[in-house]
């Protein structure tokens, strides 16, 4: 299993992400150390980048936004998300996009 995601006993999957807000477009950008790097088009103002991140991940996984929760990193580039309702196989495929 990769360092950037883990599955808890309750079935929840935790993702460690490195976010680059203010990019030209929202996209996955490979690995950044022990985190998955994501470029977001949204600016880091008034929580817009956090909202865009949750929407981007939910859309990429085919989940409702309510299945994606920002656990930590509200004001940081390094964020931890909790995701319900998907598999580690699906999550692992995000790094290859």
Swiss-Prot record:
Signal peptide: none
Superkingdom of origin organism: Bacteria
Alphabetized Pfam families for the sequence: DUF167
Entry-linked InterPro entries: DUF167, YggU-like_sf
SMART domains given in the database record: DUF167
GO cellular component, one term: cytoplasm
Family label: Belongs to the UPF0235 family.
Alphabetical list of NCBIfam families matching this protein: DUF167 family protein
Name of this chain's protein: UPF0235 protein Daro_3887
Organism whose genome encodes this protein: Dechloromonas aromatica (strain RCB)
């Amino acid at each position: 299993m990769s360092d950037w995601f883990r599955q808890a006993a309750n079935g929840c999957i935790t993702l460690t992400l490195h976010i680059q807000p203010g990019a030209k477009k929202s996209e996955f950008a490979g690995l950044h150390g022990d985190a998955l790097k994501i470029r977001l088009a949204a600016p880091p103002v008034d929580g817009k980048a956090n909202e865009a991140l949750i929407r981007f991940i939910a859309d990429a996984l085919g989940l409702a936004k309510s299945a994606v929760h920002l656990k930590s990193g509200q004001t940081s580039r390094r964020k931890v998300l909790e995701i319900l309702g998907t598999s580690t196989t699906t999550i692992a495929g995000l790094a290859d996009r």
